[in-house]
Amino acid sequence: MRFTVRSIYLLVLISTSLWGKSVQYTLSMSEPHTHLFEVEMRLDGARGTEVVALPVWTPGSYLVREYARNVQDISARSEDDTVLKIKKIDKNHWQVKGKGRQDIIVSYRVYAYEHSVRTSYLNADHALVVPASVLMYWQKNQQRNHQLHINMPENWSEITTALEPFNKPGNVDFIAKDYDELVDSPLELSNQHVVNFEVLGKPHVMALYGASNYDDSVLVSDFTKIIEAETKIFGSLPYDHYSFIFHVEEGRGGLEHANSSVNFIRRWSFNDEKRYKSLLSLVSHEFFHTWNVKRIVPKGVA
């Protein structure tokens, strides 16, 4: 039996998360038309008083966003369903008074109706999850494995993300080695058009939400050229797989992540030469950040 580096990495992550301590999330959207995500966060191995928090910014966009303003209806309980006291101690931190040596479950909702590459968005048709704006962190345990289970509406079938899946079949469970990896991995949930292709021996996926006149073969050909050209500059691809997430609607903009990018493009960008070149420029720019900024950083930031 052959084991790749990636398969060994997954085995280590999954085994430690199943048998060791982890932070576990269930992300639901039972009424997506209300624009409210429902989150349940389990603090495995909590002891006494704990603190959870929501970031104020997201990887790739280094401005204060104040995501905590969208948090609603937060509560906490112990694993035996005892209600626990939880209070907000500053603008984005909450303190939970635990019950001895019992896991703590924190539940809350997040309003998500700001459509941009740096904010989460939910409606009856699809969801863009920017994890930093939805998934809180356990203040003292950000280095643990983080597991994410997703409950989607029954009529949605696709999840596109750079996170590693586990517990197949279904692919609604994902794992990150730590909180940093989790928040650097946005997710698109819907019935988006998905195209899989391979470049330089690595799998890539292109997910497009929104109808337009794009041609899969043309996009794959041009994206392949971009990937190959930029790889020549840096020497090799620094990831095992990569996801391009596109919202094909209005506006233009992108945000880089370690193994993915989120891009907003105009609906009719594909048969107009000027607009199509603008699209390719955006893709090239965001993909360049796979190395520059995401892997090559100032010494004080590393």
Model-derived segments and spans:
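Surface-exposed beta-strand/loop patches in extracellular or lumenal glycoproteins
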Residues: 37-68, 133-153
